[in-house]
Amino acid sequence: MASPRSSGQPGPPPPPPPPPARLLLLLLLPLLLPLAPGAWGWARGAPRPPPSSPPLSIMGLMPLTKEVAKGSIGRGVLPAVELAIEQIRNESLLRPYFLDLRLYDTECDNAKGLKAFYDAIKYGPNHLMVFGGVCPSVTSIIAESLQGWNLVQLSFAATTPVLADKKKYPYFFRTVPSDNAVNPAILKLLKHYQWKRVGTLTQDVQRFSEVRNDLTGVLYGEDIEISDTESFSNDPCTSVKKLKGNDVRIILGQFDQNMAAKVFCCAYEENMYGSKYQWIIPGWYEPSWWEQVHTEANSSRCLRKNLLAAMEGYIGVDFEPLSSKQIKTISGKTPQQYEREYNNKRSGVGPSKFHGYAYDGIWVIAKTLQRAMETLHASSRHQRIQDFNYTDHTLGRIILNAMNETNFFGVTGQVVFRNGERMGTIKFTQFQDSREVKVGEYNAVADTLEIINDTIRFQGSEPPKDKTIILEQLRKISLPLYSILSALTILGMIMASAFLFFNIKNRNQKLIKMSSPYMNNLIILGGMLSYASIFLFGLDGSFVSEKTFETLCTVRTWILTVGYTTAFGAMFAKTWRVHAIFKNVKMKKKIIKDQKLLVIVGGMLLIDLCILICWQAVDPLRRTVEKYSMEPDPAGRDISIRPLLEHCENTHMTIWLGIVYAYKGLLMLFGCFLAWETRNVSIPALNDSKYIGMSVYNVGIMCIIGAAVSFLTRDQPNVQFCIVALVIIFCSTITLCLVFVPKLITLRTNPDAATQNRRFQFTQNQKKEDSKTSTSVTSVNQASTSRLEGLQSENHRLRMKITELDKDLEEVTMQLQDTPEKTTYIKQNHYQELNDILNLGNFTESTDGGKAILKNHLDQNPQLQWNTTEPSRTCKDPIEDINSPEHIQRRLSLQLPILHHAYLPSIGGVDASCVSPCVSPTASPRHRHVPPSFRVMVSGL
């Protein structure tokens, strides 16, 4: 029921459509021709104008049927359209013309939409403009062909961003903001709360992907970081988990309301809600949309209360359906007055949130046509606007330019176009207590954001942070811990000083002298240096400056290294001396002076100094700061703590530590080996050999434990310092106590213990040597126990033979005295045994004077070897008279006591210092049964 043309004559045939739409129209042409026109005629409820008023026809394309979901949009905006047409006619804005809106149902179907458009072109009047376009697919197809028909289209509900392409849709305008129009508003909101790090979560749908892509460009130009971009098709949980893994706190979501329920259920499972997170999602969902989808959410094991808990506080962004300003619009009414009239007008028809944009759209068309008529009137062409046809490029361009000049205040706010896009108002709503509350709005024209006072509500005391706030915190040594360990260290140093005083004061006591007091002093010195290093290890950035800390890196390394080498080297040297004497296979008297031990310790220190000097010269230690993984704030604040730890390191730290550990490790292993070899030495003259061995074990074990644990706890300075300090304290304290406490107890309970041992007597010459040399000990290794037992058994056997020979010699002497004329017959086997006894002097290599005299005498008189003497032989010349019984008796009476006296000391008999060779052996205090322990000769220290 289209109104007749103003000219009353058929117009020229329409021009062919542009190439993109021509093919589709040709395909549908056989179907379109038999059908009747689909115009709905006048807008329902609008009064007919007087017959004398020429109409200005407008093509209305929108879904109207109830069978289509979006048909409610078309039906919902018609009351607003009727109100606008009435008000325009009443104001005589287009006099003498009137608006003739002819409605065509597109049914949100591409084919039916094209058919409606073709019917309007073929059967209807010449339409000046196209009003409508709701469904994106239908709208985009028609809008692409408008330039060929010189028609300008104005949509009130098509928000798809693809229509913003002016190269493809140059004649398309819309009063409703595009979906992309929310991006500048989001940018403004991010800046308002100083959120500079966000993440995006997008449903794999073209509409949302386009918004996301545009948002990325907007944020990129404003230096806002998009730390993570996630998309999903059906299951958003994986994407939500990735966002959490990347520490995304501000999430910009683009998804429909059905997926929104799944997203928030996943957010609840991942604990991505509450005071630490802020979700920003589309605000165009249906009212109470969560009530409609919670059943589906429950099917995914997400209860309604869980969904609401995760949704609490989200911010929705959408265009403002009506302006909230109390300002009169172009119609002379405020938005609130219009809304009341609209509600009265719709009379049972469901409302549409686009009704305000449809209302302003009619006013845009009226104002555009008014400006176009003014332009035609001012031109010299004398053309009337009702003379428009689809081939009139000039009038089409005039209408297009008039659309771009639109600028007025409507019920939806300021109406102005920029490249065909509405610069409208964007509102922000927040989900609070199961309802959406408006909290602010963004004016695109003025580029201003207005937050309504006290309406926006965050779940924390402040807006969420855009990322985890990282508080770099230097891990320091605890002051109480440092104080306690320092106090223990001071006590240890006082104890070491007391031991040093004790050692110096009693250095002339034989008990102390036999334990090498000079080496003991070195042990004390090394212990005190080790104690001193504890103070330096506890000084970090909380006590000293960075430059001082770097200096301490070198100083404490040197002090600990030198202290360790001094103490352990002295113990090592003393253990080596015991081992060297104890392993003396030749049974020689062995003298190892303290000077030689000092050389050993000095050599170890020299090696240390060479390593340390090269280390310092080539690759010195520097202060480095190591960053560790973030830790939650113990106070529960929305921050994470990144521990920083100071280290003393250099470029080739591993190599230098390897050299030092290899050298010290080999030395320690060798020391432990020597201590193990001499573990059974228990000789009073070596009064601290066993304790020195125990000290070596102590140092070795504690150092290994300390080095291993210090590496494992390098990220915990308090634990590391505590372990290192305790290892040094225990190691030094136990060592000093093992070395000095037994001596202290012995001197206190038995001051003469060193001189009362009857198993060790010193000669006069050895006593003189005590002031110059150290103890020389002859001993046997435990590994040679069988050999020792054999020698002891042989010693006992020979002593028994001596006793038997004594008796035989006494009998011979008595016989010689009774028969001086006769030659006494001595049994050859007795001579042989006695001769063997004489030869034992060579085995012992003793320096006794009596044995040397006897040996020389026998060498000069080989005839005295009794095993070769024949008793029946008689003297035939003066030379042979020396073997006469008188000579034999005289020699035996003088030489046998000397022989007896000289031999006994070598097997545990009389003291070698006995001045009278004629004294009976039984008179000597040493002429007694030898206990089953090996006897040694000891020279004084």
Curated annotation (Swiss-Prot):
Membrane topology according to the record: Multi-pass membrane protein
Tagged with keyword Disulfide bond? yes
Tissue expr: Highly expressed in brain, especially in cerebral cortex, thalamus, hippocampus, frontal, occipital and temporal lobe, occipital pole and cerebellum, followed by corpus callosum, caudate nucleus, spinal cord, amygdala and medulla. Weakly expressed in heart, testis and skeletal muscle.
Task: Identify the main location.
Answer: membrane
Q: Where in the cell is it found?
A: Cell membrane; Postsynaptic cell membrane
Which spans of this chain does the record mark as coiled coil?
781-819
Per its UniProt record, what SUPFAM superfamilies does this chain match? Answer: Periplasmic binding protein-like I (SSF53822)
According to its record, what is known about the domains?
Alpha-helical parts of the C-terminal intracellular region mediate heterodimeric interaction with GABBR1.
What is the protein's given name? Gamma-aminobutyric acid type B receptor subunit 2
Q: Which organism is it from?
A: Homo sapiens
